[in-house]
Amino acid sequence: YYTCLNNVLESKPRIVIDDGCDLIFLAHKEYPDVVKSMYGACEETTTGIVRLRAMHKDKALKFPVVAVNNAYSKYLFDNRYGTGQSVIEGILSATNTLIAGKNVVVIGYGWCGRGIAQRLKGLGAKVHVVETSNSAPDGPSGYHRALEALYDGCWVGTLDEIADKGDVFISATGNKHVINEKHMNKMKDGAILANAGHFNNEIDLNGLESISASSKEILPNVDKYELKNGKHIILLSKGRLVNLSQPTGQGHPIEIMDASFATPVSYTHLTLPTKVEV
């Protein structure tokens, strides 16, 4: 992955279309000459926007970036319908578990989280929503999203309250260690953990290792952790994105991705100087 990122930057691009801010971050860290010659970039994901805001706050961002993720044509469709469908498909493909009647905990009720919750309800799950954010710079706060989840018919509370009752836990926050060692120790025997956020740190994997006596892969993208307390937990895709990890994760439907990729392409002209012909 990083070999590919470096290869891209060594080609001295003038504009980049990023997914997660990895390319932009690496450029600022190791390719200052490339950064100086760049017109700008586009960022596709919620997690990437979070990283970019942190860079901007620290005055570390050296060129303009269009927040494609904030476009209606992106998050209303890709985040909600694409993620909602592909995450459920990834979980079912890996586990063949029955969703109907299950207590499924969705952590994060942004557009991805609400899309996941909507499809879970359609499959007959009892959906529980945990919102971890207190405020948001350009949208409703976590309190408002939690209230929205309640009005959408979901149970709403903290992960501490529901940790011992959930059958399946799906993180969709873009934040670090939202499911931690304390939560996992409380979970029921056979609980399933899946990450639908971005990087593989939404679930505290080191914490899971520390409370486990042993672990083994029992199916592709399905690891069984035998906990020291006598229970076991199922981790999908080794904590990586459950909807993208092959062979069980197939990603979003192509109809969704057509629109998602068309959006940053159409925005690239905003990063070009006026003297450049498109």
List where the protein language model places each region.
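Conserved small/polar residues in nucleotide/adenosyl-binding loops
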Residues: 267-274
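Glycine/serine-rich phosphate-binding loop and adjoining beta1-alpha1 elements at the start
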Residues: 1-102
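Long, C-terminal catalytic modules of enzymes
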Residues: 240-263
